[in-house]
């Protein structure tokens, strides 16, 4: 039986601008008894049809739009079309950069709310993050098996956001083989080991690809400090850029061991490379007390803010760590600093970094504004898709 949602008067404006979310406070009434994931018809208060979406009774985002086309039904062909378009739109990038690891589907920005898919060689790794995507899991799997018959499909839906949708975390094989060993991918001629089963996110930070490449132009004959190094991506590019020394710092010994393997996999000389297991904040303070200086510092911390309530604390954390970095930079040194918190707006992040430089007593210049790689597109009607912000800053 069809379910009909009628919005509060005036709340249709965001949908007319093709934003894919309907919040609980924007709904005046529901006709029918939807279960989580059900496809629902969305109407303006005056009875105009607006969109077709997926119901989520547990979430503040009560419905996510599948389509704004009244003639388009949500079936296997729908998912085949969306996924095929997502692949074709990325094919030029894949060919240009020689990629065997890339984001195939970027959820709302690719018209598939709550569905993230990363491709690692012969594995497709899915994160199913919404009630709608969960409800359509079998159709999504069928579409992927049709389009990628040679690929195994693995799920990494072990993320806290599923709880907001009334879903439990889940991982495991959906189809094909289990990735028992790390998978080797390539980007820009660099080989990288990816632990699909146990690594961060779906195994690797594909969104930082362009920014990893950007670091290499600043590292020739330089001393480089790579903070929150994970499996060493920025450090590898720094070495390929001619760095005379690279210090990788992370709390995970497993990640550091893989960082070493990644450097060796690329045939790099690591005689002047360190892999240090330490808390970054504490180590930077220790370096400051010792008077250590670096020519290039990379700050790629984990997400500091998961909610608006955490944003103030996140601002303090970002300011503190960037101030420490400025204090460790040699004259003319370059800081590459990032925030992956979607709630952190570009202007706010830029202000935090500027304040950090001021508190460190350093004059600084922004050389580059950086963001996520282009296989992580940002829908023009979905600004929430712009989550990764980066700055390249030179300190005098």
Swiss-Prot record:
**Enzymatic reactions:** cytidine(1962) in 23S rRNA + S-adenosyl-L-methionine = 5-methylcytidine(1962) in 23S rRNA + S-adenosyl-L-homocysteine + H(+)
Q: Where is it chiefly localized?
A: cytoplasm
Function noted in UniProt: Specifically methylates the cytosine at position 1962 (m5C1962) of 23S rRNA.
Mind telling me which PANTHER family this protein's record contains? RIBOSOMAL RNA LARGE SUBUNIT METHYLTRANSFERASE, S-ADENOSYLMETHIONINE-DEPENDENT METHYLTRANSFERASE DOMAIN-CONTAINING PROTEIN
Q: What is its EC number?
A: 2.1.1.191
Coiled coil stretches, renumbered? none
* An example molecular function term from Gene Ontology annotations: RNA binding
Compartment(s) where it occurs, according to its Swiss-Prot or TrEMBL record: Cytoplasm
Taxonomic superkingdom: Bacteria
Source species, please? Aeromonas salmonicida (strain A449)
A GO CC term assigned to this protein in UniProt: cytoplasm
Q: Could you say which protein family the record assigns here? A: Belongs to the methyltransferase superfamily. RlmI family.
Q: Which residues form the signal peptide?
A: none
Tell me the protein's name.
Ribosomal RNA large subunit methyltransferase I
Keywords in alphabetical order: Cytoplasm, Methyltransferase, RNA-binding, rRNA processing, S-adenosyl-L-methionine, Transferase
Q: Where is the PUA domain?
A: 2-79
User: Pfam families annotated for this entry?
Assistant: Methyltrans_SAM, PUA_3
């Amino acid at each position: 039986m069809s379910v009909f949602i009628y919005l509060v008067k005036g709340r249709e404006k965001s949908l007319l601008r093709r934003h894919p979310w309907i919040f609980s406070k924007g709904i005046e009434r529901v006709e029918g008894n939807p279960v989580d994931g059900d496809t629902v018809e969305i109407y303006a208060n005056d009875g105009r049809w607006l969109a077709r979406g997926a119901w989520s009774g547990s979430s503040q985002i009560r419905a996510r739009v599948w389509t704004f086309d009244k003639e388009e039904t949500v079936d296997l062909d729908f998912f085949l079309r969306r996924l095929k378009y997502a692949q074709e739109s990325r094919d030029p990038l894949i060919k240009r950069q020689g990629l065997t690891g890339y984001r195939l589907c970027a959820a709302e920005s690719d018209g598939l709310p709550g569905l993230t898919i990363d491709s690692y060689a012969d594995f497709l790794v899915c994160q199913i993050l919404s009630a709608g995507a969960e409800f359509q899991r079998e159709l999504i799997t069928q579409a992927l098996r049709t389009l990628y018959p040679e690929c195994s499909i693995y799920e990494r839906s072990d993320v806290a956001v599923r709880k907001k949708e009334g879903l439990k975390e889940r991982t495991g094989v959906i189809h094909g083989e289990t990735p028992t060993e790390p998978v080797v991918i390539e980007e820009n001629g660099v080989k990288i080991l990816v632990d699909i089963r146990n690594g961060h996110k779906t195994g690797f930070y594909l969104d930082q690809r362009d920014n990893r490449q950007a670091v290499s132009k600043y590292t020739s004959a330089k001393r480089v400090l790579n903070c929150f190094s994970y499996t060493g991506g920025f450090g590898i590019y720094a070495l390929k850029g001619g760095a005379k020394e690279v210090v990788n710092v992370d709390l995970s010994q497993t990640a550091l061991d893989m960082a070493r393997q990644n450097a060796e996999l690329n045939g790099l000389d690591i005689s002047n490379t360190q892999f240090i297991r330490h808390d970054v904040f504490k180590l930077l303070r220790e370096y400051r007390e010792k008077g250590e200086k670096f020519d290039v510092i990379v700050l790629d911390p984990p997400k500091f803010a998961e909610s608006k309530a955490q944003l103030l604390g996140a601002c303090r954390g970002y300011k503190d760590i960037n101030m420490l970095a400025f204090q460790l930079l040699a004259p003319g040194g370059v800081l590459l600093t990032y925030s992956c918190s979607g709630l952190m707006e570009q202007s706010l992040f830029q202000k935090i970094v500027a304040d950090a430089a001021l508190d460190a007593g350093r004059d600084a210049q922004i050389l580059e504004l950086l963001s996520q790689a282009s296989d992580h597109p940002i829908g023009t009607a979905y600004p929430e898709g712009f989550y990764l912000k980066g700055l390249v800053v030179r300190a005098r």
